Every structure is written in structure tokens, then in C-alpha cells.
Amino acid sequence: MGAMAEIQFIRGINEEVVPDVRLTRARDGSSGQAMFYFDNPKIVQEGNLEVTGMYMVDEEGEIVTRDVNAKFINGQPVAIEATYTMRSPQEWDRFIRFMDRYAASHGLGFQKSENS
């Protein structure tokens, strides 16, 4: 069994819905952003909106973003959007290592857009 990587909105509780992930990166590689979109995630289905952050957990430790927002339609939560901002090449590399593990353990077709 390979290394597991999980996304959690509450520490210790894995989110089962695999998100859409979009990546942007500065041309000079100094910074980047990852936008996560979870369509009807488990935490929303369970009516738990006490979300204070998104935790990306793997063998190296934990990456945390507090930029997490629920999306509502007709007053009902339907999705969660989270943004993780990377402010250095090291943070970018660390995030990519997490995403590679997450993609491998969750069957996510994760594509890095390479600028050639």
C-alpha cells in the first residue's frame, strides 16, 4: 500500500469527495495558487458547516489553508471552495508532492500545466 494523502475539513475526518483542482503559477515560479472545488462534499451533506480550514495531510505532514468558503444555492450549502496560495518555489514543490500522492491514492487525473 502506497503513502496515503487525504484532504480534511475537520482534523481526523477525511473528505471523501474528490475535488476539481485548478492551478495557476507565476511565470517566474515564485508563487502560485491552487483552487479546489468540492461539489456536495460529505461535510456539507452532513450539515457540518463549522469549517475553519482545509488540511492536506500526507507522510510529510500537513498543509493548511484558511481560505475556505461554502457555496449556497437557495440557502442550502452545495459546495465548498478552497484556495491555497503558495508564496515560494518551496511551497509549490511541497504542494505538488502532496497532489501527486493525493492523485495516486484517489484516482484523480491531476494535470500540471507546464509552460514550455
Swiss-Prot record:
Matches recorded under Gene3D superfamilies: Photosystem II Psb28
Gene Ontology CC, one term: photosystem II oxygen evolving complex
Annotated compartments: Cellular thylakoid membrane
GO biological process, one term: photosynthesis
Record-linked InterPro entries: Psb28_c1_sf, PSII_Psb28_class-1
Membrane topology, as annotated: Peripheral membrane protein
Domain of life: Bacteria
Keyword terms of this UniProt record: Membrane, Photosynthesis, Photosystem II, Thylakoid
Presence of keyword Transit peptide: no
Quaternary structure (record): Part of a photosystem II (PSII) assembly intermediate complex PSII-I; crystallized from a strain deleted of psbJ, it forms monomeric PSII before addition of the oxygen evolving complex. PSII-I includes 3 assembly factors not found in mature PSII (Psb27, Psb28 and Psb34). This protein binds to the cytoplasmic face of D1 and D2 (psbA and psbD), contacting CP47 (psbB) directly above the quinone b-binding site.
Family, as annotated: Belongs to the Psb28 family.
Function in brief: A photosystem II (PSII) assembly factor that binds PSII during biogenesis, protecting the complex until water splitting is activated.
Protein name in UniProt: Photosystem II assembly factor Psb28 protein
